[in-house]
Amino acid sequence: MILLEVNNRIIEEILTLKFENAAAGNKPEVVEVTFADFDGVLYHVSNPNGDKAKVMISISLKFYKELQEHGADEVLKNVYGNFLVAPESGYNVSLLYDLEALPSNKDSVIHQAGMLKRNCFASVFEKYFKFQEEGKEGEKRAVIHYREDETMYVEAKKDRVTVVFSTVFKDDDDVVIGKVFMQEFKEGRRASHTAPQVLFSHREPPLELKDTDAAVGDNIGYITFVLFPRHTSANARDNTINLIHTFRDYLHYHIKCSKAYIHTRMRAKTSDFLKVLNRARPDAEKKEMKTITGKTFAAR
């Protein structure tokens, strides 16, 4: 299985190139790039007001207001400090870098810029991990509509944090492959006693979402993670956040890869069958041709 990158490589490559050119004393060049990421996220890298010595990185998340309710602004301020500026029009968060005043810790700054989406997501997890750490129970469940028709729920108890993702399968084939994929997760947990508990329910939401407006349907699935203190501790939480916030994308990515692999195997097998059939086909019977006088035609 392939782990998706948590960071955004495009941002890191652009910023690395800009910093290297600035450090070498090269004349700055114009940058104007707009690109998308998972979950409907949109990035924009540009020179604000046409100033080539400045690089602005902006991100648009349709669900950012919901993240703000859980302290996203404070988390980003702690991570980015003075690089965080008023957001560009049409975007939720903007970072500004001055190529004439390069930071001493360039590698770290570049890496954190590439983690912008992840750090936006981190606020809701950090909040509920802290609730669990402090033994708080009964706090209102977090509900994040991270996609148009898909939702994430986070709830804290004294001994665990429960994270539930709802997801929509577009095809019947996706449901089948998704079930097999999730069964492998359950089997894999038996080999690792430190792994979180993973549950999958099809059509109906899990008991944790009882009496909510959680969607129900043949193409709806729910993935539940039960995170214990060993997963939410100060030493482990960063890695937990890295892995869990990309899980929905990870699942659907592997469903698509599985379908592509199956189709490739089917095409290869069909090609093999055609070769066998062609070899087994009998040669056409040669019909003897004669003239009216009884002479036989001979092929030249």
Swiss-Prot record:
Q: Which compartment or compartments is the protein found in?
A: Cytoplasm, Cytoskeleton; Cell projection; Nucleus
Q: Determine if Thylakoid is one of this entry's keywords.
A: no
Q: Which UniProt keywords apply?
A: Actin-binding, Cell projection, Cytoplasm, Cytoskeleton, Nucleus
For this protein, the record's InterPro entries field holds:
ARPC2, ARPC2/4
Query: Is Nucleus among this UniProt entry's keywords?
Result: yes
* One GO CC term on file: site of double-strand break
Give the record's GO biological process terms: actin filament polymerization; Arp2/3 complex-mediated actin nucleation
Q: Fetch the Pfam families from UniProt.
A: P34-Arc
GO MF annotation terms: actin filament binding; structural constituent of cytoskeleton
- Report the function annotation for this chain: Actin-binding component of the Arp2/3 complex, a multiprotein complex that mediates actin polymerization upon stimulation by nucleation-promoting factor (NPF). The Arp2/3 complex mediates the formation of branched actin networks in the cytoplasm, providing the force for cell motility. In addition to its role in the cytoplasmic cytoskeleton, the Arp2/3 complex also promotes actin polymerization in the nucleus, thereby regulating gene transcription and repair of damaged DNA.
Q: How does it assemble?
A: Component of the Arp2/3 complex composed of actr2/arp2, actr3/arp3, arpc1 (arpc1a or arpc1b), arpc2, arpc3, arpc4 and arpc5.
Sequence similarity: Belongs to the ARPC2 family.
Q: Which PANTHER family match?
A: ACTIN-RELATED PROTEIN 2_3 COMPLEX SUBUNIT 2, ARP2/3 COMPLEX 34 KDA SUBUNIT
What is this protein identified as? Actin-related protein 2/3 complex subunit 2-B
